[in-house]
């Protein structure tokens, strides 16, 4: 089996330093026993766009995902990249006025906007069994050989908790899977006080405040409950499905929390060169980032116990973090590389990864799965890190293209669901304003 773990925002520098301090035993073991290095990324370092490039091997202009949201005007869909160009030409005030007058609306992008086939569909079409959990734009869940738990599954308990309309359609495939995992979904208000104090040094009163505080962009007080609910949901569902689904050829899952907590809390951490941060804030929030890396190491250990020792493991991140000239920690201007670990199974041992980029992962996964690589994919197979016993027995083959994605039955739009998802994206720091 191929085990593909996506961790948003996992930074090479922080990972290396914590490994050197023996804080991350499972990451340390994999980096020492496998191949490890940096993964080159692209600009803009937009998570939705990059993770879609990773599973298609193509750029945004080909796969169709350029942001987290798009615009709707007179029943026409306008991509954010197109809208930005118009605003640069002087149309910003006009667009803002049209949004205020509700002539233009925004909505969160979904898998319906992906124009080309993903590796999940390519493998399924070739009768390979695939399991997917929480990948960007995996909703609506399409029929594949295996299962999909979409990135909107946290909304599967809306009707129970909020008394609102029914949850969105096709949160999982098969549909019956939602019932099986519904008790594993952790909502933000269900995160307990002990979980907060694992990451921050605060009083019980302050922890209670964190549970109810209103959204503030990239403020740890408001975002911690959201990122914990997401990653705990993914962790619980992954462990459950690894027990109950056997014979998978690819198991792919994605965790978001490190990216969000890095945006919120690196400013309080030891990695901040700026000494103007108040001592009390550092005391409360200084351990948040390193503690979250340790949490992810624990999750990794739990997952590894559920898979065969012969599993080929890929761990990748879309970008890292750096402290930029303005003192803020980000990735938008400097395009810091992410992390790539290739370990176990058919991968070599103890080799440093050089010249790998995000577009190489789709071709490499197809090759390891015994499938042709499409010539119109931007990346290459990372053969230098695959054992020669495998490469000698498996010649690389290619096809011209896997073509466009088939048009699926559209999901009925739900304005209230879209608004709730936009609010969640704001709460997680992925969108600032509708512009």
Name each model-derived stretch.
Residues 36-55, 133-142, 254-257, 319-323, ...:
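Short, solvent-exposed turn/loop segments enriched in Gly/Ser/Thr/Pro and often Arg
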Residues 383-435:
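Long, internal low-complexity/basic segments
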Residues 28-29, 120-124, 301, 344, ...:
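Non-catalytic, well-ordered alpha-helical segments in soluble enzyme domains
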Residues 322-323, 353, 358-360, 370-402:
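Polar, surface-exposed loop/tail segments
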Residues 15-69, 131:
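Short, structured active-site-proximal loop/turn typified by the sulfatase FGly-forming signature C/S-X-P-X-R
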Residues 14, 105-113, 224, 286-290, ...:
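Active-site rim elements
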Residues 58-279:
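His/Asp/Glu-rich, glycine-adjacent segments
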Residues 310, 315-345:
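Histidine-centered active-site microenvironments of extracellular/periplasmic hydrolases
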């Amino acid at each position: 089996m191929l085990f593909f773990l996506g961790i948003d925002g996992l930074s090479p520098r922080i990972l290396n330093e914590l490994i050197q301090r023996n804080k991350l035993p499972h990451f340390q073991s994999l980096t020492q026993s496998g191949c490890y290095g940096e993964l080159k990324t692209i600009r803009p370092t937009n998570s939705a766009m990059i993770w879609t490039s990773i599973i298609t091997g193509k750029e945004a202009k080909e796969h169709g995902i350029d942001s987290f949201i798009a615009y709707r005007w007179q029943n026409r869909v306008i991509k954010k990249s197109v809208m930005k160009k118009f605003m640069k030409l002087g149309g910003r005030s006009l667009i803002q006025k049209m949004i205020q007058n509700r002539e233009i609306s925004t909505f969160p992008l979904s898998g319906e906007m992906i124009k080309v086939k993903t590796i999940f569909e390519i493998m399924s079409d070739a009768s390979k069994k695939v399991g997917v959990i929480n990948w960007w734009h995996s909703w609506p869940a399409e029929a594949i050989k295996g299962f999909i738990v979409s990135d909107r599954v946290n909304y599967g308990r809306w009707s129970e908790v909020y008394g609102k309309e029914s949850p969105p359609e096709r949160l999982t495939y098969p549909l019956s899977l939602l019932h099986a995992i519904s008790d594993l979904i952790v909502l933000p208000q269900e995160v307990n006080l002990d979980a907060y104090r694992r990451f921050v040094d605060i009083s019980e009163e302050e922890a209670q405040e964190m549970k109810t505080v209103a959204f503030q962009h990239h403020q740890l007080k408001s975002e911690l409950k959201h990122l914990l609910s997401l990653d705990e949901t993914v962790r619980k569902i992954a462990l459950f499905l690894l027990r109950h689904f056997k014979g998978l050829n690819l198991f792919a899952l994605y965790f978001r929390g490190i990216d969000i907590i890095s945006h919120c809390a690196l400013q309080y951490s030891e990695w901040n060169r700026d000494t103007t941060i108040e001592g009390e804030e550092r005391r409360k929030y200084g351990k948040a980032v390193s503690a979250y890396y340790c949490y992810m190491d624990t999750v990794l250990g739990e997952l590894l116990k559920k898979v065969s020792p012969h599993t080929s493991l890929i761990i990748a991140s879309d970008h890292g973090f750096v402290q930029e000239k303005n003192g803020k920690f980000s990735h938008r201007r400097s395009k810091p590389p992410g992390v790539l670990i290739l370990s176990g199974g058919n991968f070599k041992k103890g080799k440093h990864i050089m010249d790998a980029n995000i577009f190489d992962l789709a071709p490499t996964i197809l090759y390891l799965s015994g499938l042709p690589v499409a010539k119109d994919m931007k990346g290459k197979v990372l053969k230098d890190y695959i054992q020669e016993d495998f490469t000698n027995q498996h010649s690389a083959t290619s096809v011209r293209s896997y073509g466009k994605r088939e048009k699926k039955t559209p999901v009925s739009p739900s304005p209230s669901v879209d608004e709730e998802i936009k609010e969640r994206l704001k709460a997680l720091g992925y969108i600032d304003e509708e512009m």
